From Swiss-Prot:
Mg(2+) 1 binds at E92, D114, L116. Mg(2+) 2 binds at D114, D117, E281. It comes from Delftia acidovorans (strain DSM 14801 / SPH-1). Keywords: Carbohydrate metabolism, Cytoplasm, Hydrolase, Magnesium, Metal-binding. Transmembrane segments: none annotated. It is an enzyme of class 3 (hydrolase). This is Fructose-1,6-bisphosphatase class 1. It holds the Pfam family FBPase. It catalyses: beta-D-fructose 1,6-bisphosphate + H2O = beta-D-fructose 6-phosphate + phosphate. Its cofactor is Mg(2+). One of its GO terms (biological process) is fructose metabolic process. One of its GO terms (molecular function) is fructose 1,6-bisphosphate 1-phosphatase activity.
Length: 335
């Protein structure tokens, strides 16, 4: 791997040498990265910048919005609306789609994002992040409708996340493996630190909110019980449990050293298939994980094959090290 390769140079080389990234997509990804730098600056200021605490409003899901939720959402919209790369955007924080205003040129891409994942951790200074996904606008009709966003995850042309932790790190795929970039604040740009990330097929770490165990379905309970049984149990090895309550942070750990992340269906909301959003969280993370050699399902079906029917559709998520995800999926099929 070459040293000190900036994100811009990396994307240009991907476009020039490999032909993987069309010019407009390259420019779009650079704009998203710049927006993430701005969000990182706001996160870093914390109380000094008066960005902590709640905003006194709720999002479309009925969740209390943090000030930084709104700031991050506005940053992403303002950064991306005028560049000519997009036709429309959709955000976890907005009820409907956001059409690029007519005063700006329109592009061929659709951008979806969770502007600040894990925002319950903002005030306690735990890692949070931005998740994004890019689709191509379907051809054959003028304008953009919500239906244009109803594409399975297999149709993504780019996906990534930016984690705001001890370092600000951008993780990206355009369908040719996963690369990681760390923000060099002195240089002012993201710098390539790892290419072709691979998630180990086996692991001894699982991430799940154990306080909800009584609400889980039998297959998930079975899997976790076997992990807890340790070396004396049917798995024959001891497991560690991790849970940060920030999907970006939990998935980033899996990208770095393996593991399995589970946010399953539970009985408290039996009519909802899960908690996480398919379009803004599950699809981009599932594609990243698969591109790194892992797997991602809802327990029964590959996440990327799910056909969305609504903008804020929810889904159960089981992703990470391939053999462990297959084990949980097997238990669902046997139930």
């Amino acid at each position: 791997m070459k040293k000190n390769v900036s994100l811009t140079r990396y994307l240009v080389e991907q476009q020039r040498v490999d032909g993987l990234i069309p010019g407009q997509l390259r420019l779009l990804l650079e704009v998203v990265a710049r927006a993430c730098k701005r969000i990182s600056q706001s996160v870093n200021k914390g109380a000094i910048g008066d960005v902590l605490g709640t905003a006194g409003s709720e999002n479309v899901q009925g969740e209390v919005q943090k000030k930084l939720d709104i700031i991050a959402n506005e940053v992403l919209i303002e950064a991306n609306e005028w560049g000519g790369h997009l036709a429309a955007m959709a955000s976890e924080e907005m009820e409907g789609i956001y059409l690029v205003p007519n005063r700006y040129p329109h592009g061929e891409y659709l951008l979806m994002f969770d502007p600040l994942d894990g925002s319950s951790n903002i005030d306690v200074n735990v890692s949070i992040g931005t998740i994004f996904s890019v689709l191509k606008k379907p051809e054959g009709h003028p304008g953009v409708t919500e239906q244009d966003f109803m594409q399975p995850g297999t149709q993504q042309v780019a996906a990534g996340y930016c984690i705001y932790g001890p370092q600000t790190t951008l993780v990206l795929t355009v369908g040719d493996g996963v690369s990681m970039f760390t923000l060099d604040r002195e240089q002012g740009s993201f710098v390539l630190v790892q290419e072709n990330i691979r998630i180990p097929e086996d692991t001894k770490e699982f991430a799940i909110n154990m306080s909800n165990m009584r609400h889980w379905d039998t297959p998930v309970k079975r899997y976790v019980d076997e992990c807890l049984a340790g070396v004396e149990g049917p798995r024959g090895k001891d497991f560690n449990m991790r849970w940060i309550a920030s999907m970006v942070a939990d998935v980033h750990r899996i990208m770095t050293r393996g593991g399995i992340f589970m946010y399953p269906w539970d009985r408290r909301e039996p009519n909802k298939p899960g908690k996480l959003r398919l379009m803004y969280e599950a699809n981009p993370m599932a594609w990243l994980v698969e591109q790194a050699g892992g797997a991602a399902t809802n327990g029964k079906q590959r996440i990327l094959d799910i056909q969305p029917t609504q903008l804020h559709e929810r889904v159960s998520v089981i992703l990470g090290s391939k053999n462990e995800v297959e084990k949980v999926t097997q238990y669902h099929s046997e139930a």
